[in-house]
Protein backbone atom coordinates (compact mmCIF):
# COMPACT_ATOMS: atom_id res chain seq x y z
CA UNK A 1 0.00 0.00 0.00
CA UNK A 2 1.52 3.27 -1.16
CA UNK A 3 0.77 6.31 0.99
CA UNK A 4 1.30 9.97 0.23
CA UNK A 5 3.45 11.90 2.68
CA UNK A 6 0.31 13.73 3.85
CA UNK A 7 -1.51 10.45 4.53
CA UNK A 8 1.46 9.09 6.45
CA UNK A 9 1.84 12.28 8.50
CA UNK A 10 -1.85 12.15 9.43
CA UNK A 11 -1.49 8.57 10.69
CA UNK A 12 1.73 9.37 12.57
CA UNK A 13 0.13 12.40 14.23
CA UNK A 14 -2.82 10.33 15.43
CA UNK A 15 -0.47 7.62 16.71
CA UNK A 16 1.31 10.23 18.84
CA UNK A 17 -1.91 10.61 20.85
CA UNK A 18 -2.21 6.87 21.62
CA UNK A 19 -0.68 4.74 24.33
CA UNK A 20 0.99 1.50 23.20
CA UNK A 21 -1.73 -0.93 24.29
CA UNK A 22 -3.61 -3.65 22.46
CA UNK A 23 -6.66 -1.38 22.42
CA UNK A 24 -4.76 1.30 20.49
CA UNK A 25 -4.88 -0.74 17.29
CA UNK A 26 -8.67 -0.82 17.44
CA UNK A 27 -8.79 2.97 17.66
CA UNK A 28 -6.25 3.31 14.87
CA UNK A 29 -8.23 1.02 12.56
CA UNK A 30 -11.46 2.88 13.35
CA UNK A 31 -9.78 6.19 12.49
CA UNK A 32 -8.23 4.88 9.25
CA UNK A 33 -10.58 2.12 8.01
CA UNK A 34 -9.20 2.18 4.46
CA UNK A 35 -5.69 1.20 5.59
CA UNK A 36 -4.80 -2.43 6.25
CA UNK A 37 -4.28 -3.66 9.79
CA UNK A 38 -0.75 -4.81 8.94
CA UNK A 39 0.22 -1.42 7.53
CA UNK A 40 -1.13 0.45 10.55
CA UNK A 41 0.56 -1.95 12.97
CA UNK A 42 3.90 -1.55 11.20
CA UNK A 43 3.65 2.25 11.22
CA UNK A 44 2.64 2.26 14.89
CA UNK A 45 5.59 0.03 15.79
CA UNK A 46 8.02 2.30 13.94
CA UNK A 47 6.63 5.47 15.51
CA UNK A 48 6.80 3.87 18.96
CA UNK A 49 10.43 2.86 18.40
CA UNK A 50 11.24 6.46 17.46
CA UNK A 51 9.66 7.65 20.70
CA UNK A 52 11.64 5.07 22.70
CA UNK A 53 14.89 6.31 21.12
CA UNK A 54 14.02 9.94 21.88
CA UNK A 55 13.30 9.23 25.56
CA UNK A 56 15.84 6.45 26.15
CA UNK A 57 18.45 8.64 27.81
CA UNK A 58 16.19 10.06 30.52
CA UNK A 59 15.18 6.56 31.66
CA UNK A 60 18.78 5.41 31.97
CA UNK A 61 20.34 8.13 34.07
CA UNK A 62 21.78 6.79 37.36
CA UNK A 63 19.09 8.74 39.24
CA UNK A 64 16.26 7.23 37.17
CA UNK A 65 17.61 3.68 37.53
CA UNK A 66 17.95 4.02 41.30
CA UNK A 67 14.45 5.51 41.56
CA UNK A 68 12.90 2.66 39.55
CA UNK A 69 14.76 0.03 41.55
CA UNK A 70 13.84 1.61 44.90
CA UNK A 71 10.18 1.84 43.84
CA UNK A 72 10.24 -1.81 42.85
CA UNK A 73 11.76 -2.95 46.17
CA UNK A 74 9.33 -0.86 48.24
CA UNK A 75 6.22 -1.89 46.33
CA UNK A 76 7.07 -5.57 46.05
CA UNK A 77 7.70 -5.71 49.81
CA UNK A 78 4.08 -4.62 50.33
CA UNK A 79 2.48 -6.97 47.82
CA UNK A 80 4.60 -9.14 45.52
CA UNK A 81 1.53 -10.20 43.51
CA UNK A 82 0.87 -6.71 42.13
CA UNK A 83 2.51 -6.16 38.68
CA UNK A 84 4.77 -3.40 40.01
CA UNK A 85 7.12 -3.10 37.05
CA UNK A 86 4.30 -3.06 34.52
CA UNK A 87 2.45 -0.34 36.43
CA UNK A 88 5.65 1.67 36.88
CA UNK A 89 6.42 1.46 33.15
CA UNK A 90 2.95 2.75 32.29
CA UNK A 91 3.25 5.50 34.89
CA UNK A 92 6.49 6.92 33.46
CA UNK A 93 5.58 6.16 29.81
CA UNK A 94 8.37 3.63 29.31
CA UNK A 95 8.43 0.31 27.47
CA UNK A 96 7.52 -2.50 29.95
CA UNK A 97 10.19 -4.78 28.46
CA UNK A 98 12.85 -2.08 28.81
CA UNK A 99 11.71 -1.32 32.35
CA UNK A 100 12.10 -5.00 33.16
CA UNK A 101 15.58 -5.01 31.63
CA UNK A 102 16.61 -1.90 33.58
CA UNK A 103 15.46 -3.22 36.96
CA UNK A 104 16.77 -6.74 36.30
CA UNK A 105 20.19 -5.36 35.42
CA UNK A 106 20.22 -3.32 38.65
CA UNK A 107 19.10 -6.36 40.67
CA UNK A 108 21.84 -8.58 39.23
CA UNK A 109 24.41 -5.91 40.01
CA UNK A 110 23.41 -6.18 43.69
CA UNK A 111 23.02 -9.96 43.59
CA UNK A 112 26.33 -10.78 41.87
CA UNK A 113 28.37 -7.78 42.93
CA UNK A 114 29.01 -6.71 39.35
CA UNK A 115 26.99 -5.71 36.26
CA UNK A 116 25.72 -8.69 34.24
CA UNK A 117 27.00 -9.37 30.75
CA UNK A 118 24.64 -8.70 27.86
CA UNK A 119 24.30 -12.43 26.99
CA UNK A 120 23.32 -13.25 30.58
CA UNK A 121 20.82 -10.40 30.73
CA UNK A 122 19.30 -11.30 27.36
CA UNK A 123 18.97 -14.97 28.25
CA UNK A 124 17.10 -14.11 31.46
CA UNK A 125 14.73 -11.82 29.58
CA UNK A 126 14.03 -14.60 27.07
CA UNK A 127 13.55 -17.11 29.88
CA UNK A 128 12.65 -15.38 33.19
CA UNK A 129 12.81 -18.73 35.02
CA UNK A 130 16.61 -18.24 34.96
CA UNK A 131 16.29 -15.19 37.23
CA UNK A 132 17.42 -16.20 40.75
CA UNK A 133 14.56 -14.29 42.46
CA UNK A 134 11.15 -15.90 41.66
CA UNK A 135 9.21 -12.71 42.48
CA UNK A 136 11.30 -10.63 40.09
CA UNK A 137 11.09 -13.44 37.53
CA UNK A 138 7.30 -13.16 37.58
CA UNK A 139 7.43 -9.36 37.36
CA UNK A 140 9.74 -9.55 34.33
CA UNK A 141 7.52 -12.18 32.71
CA UNK A 142 4.47 -9.92 33.06
CA UNK A 143 6.34 -7.04 31.42
CA UNK A 144 7.51 -9.17 28.51
CA UNK A 145 4.10 -10.63 27.65
CA UNK A 146 2.34 -7.27 28.00
CA UNK A 147 4.73 -5.26 25.84
CA UNK A 148 3.24 -5.14 22.35
CA UNK A 149 6.21 -3.48 20.64
CA UNK A 150 9.42 -4.38 22.50
CA UNK A 151 11.20 -7.30 24.07
CA UNK A 152 12.22 -10.86 23.17
CA UNK A 153 8.65 -12.02 22.48
CA UNK A 154 8.07 -9.22 19.97
CA UNK A 155 11.52 -9.75 18.46
CA UNK A 156 10.69 -13.41 17.91
CA UNK A 157 7.39 -12.54 16.23
CA UNK A 158 9.08 -9.98 13.96
CA UNK A 159 11.76 -12.49 13.00
CA UNK A 160 9.09 -15.10 12.16
CA UNK A 161 7.11 -12.61 10.05
CA UNK A 162 10.27 -11.56 8.20
CA UNK A 163 11.12 -15.20 7.48
CA UNK A 164 7.54 -15.86 6.33
CA UNK A 165 7.79 -13.10 3.71
CA UNK A 166 11.20 -14.30 2.53
CA UNK A 167 9.64 -17.73 1.99
CA UNK A 168 6.74 -16.08 0.14
CA UNK A 169 9.19 -14.28 -2.14
CA UNK A 170 11.01 -17.51 -2.97
CA UNK A 171 7.69 -19.26 -3.66
CA UNK A 172 6.65 -16.49 -6.07
CA UNK A 173 9.96 -16.74 -7.91
CA UNK A 174 9.64 -20.52 -8.22
CA UNK A 175 6.05 -20.21 -9.48
CA UNK A 176 7.36 -18.09 -12.34
CA UNK A 177 10.33 -20.36 -13.03
CA UNK A 178 12.87 -17.70 -12.13
CA UNK A 179 16.25 -19.13 -11.16
CA UNK A 180 17.85 -17.41 -8.17
CA UNK A 181 20.37 -17.70 -5.37
CA UNK A 182 19.21 -17.03 -1.80
CA UNK A 183 21.21 -15.64 1.12
CA UNK A 184 22.42 -19.04 2.34
CA UNK A 185 23.70 -19.99 -1.11
CA UNK A 186 25.38 -16.62 -1.51
CA UNK A 187 27.14 -16.94 1.85
CA UNK A 188 28.55 -20.28 0.74
CA UNK A 189 30.02 -18.42 -2.23
CA UNK A 190 31.78 -16.03 0.15
CA UNK A 191 29.46 -13.02 0.07
CA UNK A 192 29.05 -11.37 3.47
CA UNK A 193 26.37 -8.74 2.77
CA UNK A 194 23.69 -9.79 0.30
CA UNK A 195 20.05 -9.14 -0.65
CA UNK A 196 17.50 -11.88 0.00
CA UNK A 197 17.77 -13.21 -3.56
CA UNK A 198 19.90 -12.61 -6.63
CA UNK A 199 18.32 -13.53 -9.95
CA UNK A 200 20.49 -15.77 -12.10
CA UNK A 201 18.84 -14.21 -15.16
CA UNK A 202 17.73 -10.59 -14.68
CA UNK A 203 14.16 -9.46 -15.38
CA UNK A 204 12.58 -6.09 -16.14
CA UNK A 205 9.99 -4.49 -13.86
CA UNK A 206 8.21 -1.33 -15.02
CA UNK A 207 10.82 -0.96 -17.73
CA UNK A 208 13.79 -1.27 -15.35
CA UNK A 209 16.14 -4.25 -15.30
CA UNK A 210 16.66 -5.78 -11.84
CA UNK A 211 19.25 -8.30 -10.67
CA UNK A 212 18.27 -8.74 -7.03
CA UNK A 213 15.24 -8.52 -4.72
CA UNK A 214 15.15 -7.54 -1.04
CA UNK A 215 12.13 -8.44 1.11
CA UNK A 216 11.09 -6.10 3.94
CA UNK A 217 8.17 -7.19 6.13
CA UNK A 218 7.56 -3.63 7.26
CA UNK A 219 6.30 -0.23 6.14
CA UNK A 220 8.85 1.93 4.35
CA UNK A 221 8.97 5.27 6.16
CA UNK A 222 11.58 7.98 5.64
CA UNK A 223 13.80 7.07 8.59
CA UNK A 224 13.95 3.31 7.97
CA UNK A 225 14.33 3.68 4.20
CA UNK A 226 17.19 6.17 4.58
CA UNK A 227 18.96 3.72 6.90
CA UNK A 228 18.39 0.79 4.55
CA UNK A 229 19.67 2.79 1.57
CA UNK A 230 22.87 3.65 3.42
CA UNK A 231 23.48 0.28 5.09
CA UNK A 232 22.15 -2.15 2.48
CA UNK A 233 20.59 -1.06 -0.80
CA UNK A 234 23.40 1.05 -2.25
CA UNK A 235 25.90 -1.64 -1.26
CA UNK A 236 23.82 -4.20 -3.16
CA UNK A 237 23.64 -1.84 -6.14
CA UNK A 238 27.41 -1.36 -6.17
CA UNK A 239 28.05 -5.10 -6.06
CA UNK A 240 25.18 -6.63 -8.02
CA UNK A 241 23.61 -3.83 -10.08
CA UNK A 242 20.02 -2.50 -10.03
CA UNK A 243 17.45 -4.21 -7.82
CA UNK A 244 13.96 -4.25 -6.34
CA UNK A 245 12.90 -3.71 -2.72
CA UNK A 246 9.51 -5.07 -1.67
CA UNK A 247 7.98 -3.32 1.35
CA UNK A 248 5.16 -5.80 1.94
CA UNK A 249 3.24 -3.40 4.23
CA UNK A 250 3.59 -0.39 1.95
CA UNK A 251 5.74 2.73 1.81
CA UNK A 252 5.62 6.50 1.38
CA UNK A 253 5.30 6.94 -2.37
CA UNK A 254 7.80 9.83 -2.53
CA UNK A 255 10.55 7.40 -1.47
CA UNK A 256 10.33 5.59 -4.81
CA UNK A 257 12.60 8.24 -6.33
CA UNK A 258 15.70 6.20 -7.19
CA UNK A 259 14.32 4.15 -10.08
CA UNK A 260 16.54 5.77 -12.67
CA UNK A 261 19.54 5.17 -10.43
CA UNK A 262 18.68 1.49 -10.05
CA UNK A 263 16.57 0.89 -6.92
CA UNK A 264 12.84 0.23 -7.36
CA UNK A 265 10.21 0.02 -4.63
CA UNK A 266 7.08 -2.16 -4.67
CA UNK A 267 4.47 -3.09 -2.05
CA UNK A 268 4.11 -6.65 -3.36
CA UNK A 269 5.47 -9.08 -5.91
CA UNK A 270 5.47 -7.38 -9.34
CA UNK A 271 2.27 -7.85 -11.32
CA UNK A 272 4.16 -7.90 -14.62
CA UNK A 273 7.65 -9.17 -15.35
CA UNK A 274 9.58 -8.99 -18.60
CA UNK A 275 11.71 -12.08 -18.98
CA UNK A 276 15.04 -11.30 -20.61
CA UNK A 277 16.14 -14.01 -22.99
CA UNK A 278 19.65 -12.82 -23.71
CA UNK A 279 21.38 -10.06 -21.77
CA UNK A 280 24.82 -8.55 -21.98
CA UNK A 281 26.09 -6.37 -19.15
CA UNK A 282 27.14 -2.88 -20.14
CA UNK A 283 28.26 0.28 -18.39
CA UNK A 284 27.20 3.63 -19.80
CA UNK A 285 29.31 6.78 -20.00
CA UNK A 286 28.20 7.80 -16.50
CA UNK A 287 29.30 4.51 -14.96
CA UNK A 288 25.69 3.32 -14.54
CA UNK A 289 24.86 -0.39 -14.80
CA UNK A 290 22.76 -1.13 -17.92
CA UNK A 291 21.68 -4.19 -19.85
CA UNK A 292 21.37 -4.87 -23.58
CA UNK A 293 18.61 -7.46 -23.71
CA UNK A 294 17.24 -9.53 -26.59
CA UNK A 295 14.36 -12.00 -26.99
CA UNK A 296 12.09 -10.44 -24.39
CA UNK A 297 8.92 -12.26 -23.35
CA UNK A 298 6.20 -10.82 -21.16
CA UNK A 299 4.86 -12.76 -18.17
CA UNK A 300 1.86 -11.64 -16.16
CA UNK A 301 1.98 -12.49 -12.46
CA UNK A 302 -0.97 -13.18 -10.24
CA UNK A 303 -1.72 -10.61 -7.57
Curated annotation (Swiss-Prot):
| GO terms under cellular component | cytoplasm; nucleus
Q: Where in the cell is it found?
A: Nucleus; Cytoplasm
Q: Which UniProt keywords apply?
A: Cytoplasm, Nucleus
Q: Name one Pfam family in it.
A: TPD
Q: Does the record carry Cytoplasm as a key word?
A: yes
Q: Which GO terms describe its biological process?
A: erythrocyte differentiation
Which function does this protein serve? Answer: May play a role in erythroid cell differentiation.
What PANTHER family does the record point to? CDAN1-INTERACTING NUCLEASE 1 (PTHR31661:SF1), SIMILAR TO CDNA SEQUENCE BC052040 (PTHR31661)
Q: What's the protein name?
A: CDAN1-interacting nuclease 1
